[in-house]
Amino acid sequence: MFKSKQIFTAIIFVALSLVILITANITKDIPLKDLKSEFKNESSRFVEVDGILVHYTDEGEGTPIILLHGTGASLHTWDLWAEKLKENYRVLRITLPGFGLSGPRLDKRYEIKDYVNLLDSFV
């Protein structure tokens, strides 16, 4: 009986610890206007593609190059590259839906084929 009480107490302790850790790390979303004031720059543009507001930049002239970021990033991943490339190329950088200043997908689908379709519609 004593051993089962210890196990029960340990389970309750672990569960409460997890709840405290999880709730302590919850943060509110930063309002879009605050994000725009920090991350929008003179090259920033917005266009609606397939019902999604997409943040992109279009700089330079010449053969176009499209730069796409990875998971958890934005078009700013390419800031240093774009600075050099735009001297000889037209550089388009896109923030994919659900990241940075681009809006979310209303259907909440974020698969590769969805990004390919969005890119196809964008160009």
Where are these regions (language model features)?
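Alpha-helix termini
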Residues: 10, 64, 82-83, 108-113, ...
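Conserved HGGG/HGGXW glycine-rich cap/lid loop of the alpha/beta-hydrolase fold
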Residues: 52, 57-101
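Alpha/beta-hydrolase fold catalytic core
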Residues: 2-63, 88-89
